[in-house]
Amino acid sequence: MHAYVYKSQLKPDTYVYVPRRDDFSALPAPLLTSLGALTFVLDVALEARRRLAQADPDKVRSEMNERGFYLQVPPSVSSLMPRHYD
C-alpha cells in the first residue's frame, strides 16, 4: 500500500495520510476545515517492514483501508511530562 502524507498548516505536528495524491474526499468536511491548507510532504510505501517516525504502519494501513485516511496528531503535552506522585 502506498500513502501520500500532508502537513496541516493550522495544527502543528499534524499529518494526514491518504491513498491517492491530492484526494481528500474521504476526510469529513469539519476535519478538513480545522486542518486548514494541507502541504504535501512525502509519499511512502507502507510495507510490513517499513518504520514510521510517529505512527504504526499497521495502524496507518488499517485506518486508510477502513476510513480512507489516517490522521496523525502529536502526542499530548501531558503524556510527555513526567508524573509526580505525593
UniProtKB/Swiss-Prot annotation:
YcgL domain span: 1-85
InterPro entries: YcgL-like_sf (IPR038068), YcgL_dom (IPR027354)
Database matches in HAMAP family: UPF0745
Name of this chain's protein: YcgL domain-containing protein Smal_3906
